[in-house]
């Protein structure tokens, strides 16, 4: 552990613009050396169940569509990158810490797809899977990843799965949210201690 470690914790409203702005503020004002973002997401993979954790290998914008200008779906115009790679060192540390802190929870590593919409329709979910693959779908990770990437800051997006992204959620959202927050706090505190 570094003796100079001083973490900043932020809270922002939902959506990609808010997430990107928050990340840019962390870069510009606080000069952060890494960004670890935790939250909840819907599952895009049949093996990833409610309560499981997904650690990002990369993040992308599933709702970006500039095909008419010759870009791939998901690719931001005038950028070569199709997705933004998460930091491997942070991901390995998170995987290790997850097993130590929450051994009963399954941990997956994979792509996280972001868009400014809550996915609860199976046909929309299936379209995202067909186009991009991925393990989880949510509303902030790609903006965080993009801002971190453009600022040359290592990042990791960590998501607890809250639903199957198909309208079949059975657990009370407030109940799940509290459990997810508890797991995320344990994970983040432990990761910071080991950085």
In which residue ranges do the predicted regions lie?
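Mid-sequence, gly/pro-rich, charge-dense loop/helix-turn segments that line enzyme active sites
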Residues: 44-132
């Amino acid at each position: 552990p570094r003796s100079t470690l001083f973490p900043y914790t932020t809270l922002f409203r939902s959506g990609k613009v808010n997430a990107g702005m928050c990340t840019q503020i962390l870069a510009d004002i606080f000069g952060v050396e890494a960004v670890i973002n935790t939250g909840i997401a819907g599952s895009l993979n049949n093996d990833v169940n409610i309560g499981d954790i997904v650690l990002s290998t990369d993040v992308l914008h599933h709702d970006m569509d500039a095909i008419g200008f010759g870009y791939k779906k998901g690719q931001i115009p005038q950028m070569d990158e199709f997705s933004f790679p998460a930091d491997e060192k942070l991901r390995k540390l998170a995987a290790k810490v997850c097993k130590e802190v929450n051994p009963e929870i399954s941990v997956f590593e994979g792509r996280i797809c972001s868009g400014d919409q809550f996915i609860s329709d199976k046909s929309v979910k299936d379209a995202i899977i067909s186009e991009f693959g991925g393990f989880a779908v949510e509303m902030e990770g790609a903006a965080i990843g993009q801002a971190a990437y453009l600022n040359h800051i290592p990042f990791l997006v960590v998501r607890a799965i809250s639903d199957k992204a198909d309208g079949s959620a059975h657990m009370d959202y407030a109940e799940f949210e509290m459990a997810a927050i508890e797991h995320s706090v344990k994970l983040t505190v432990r990761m910071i201690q080991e950085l």
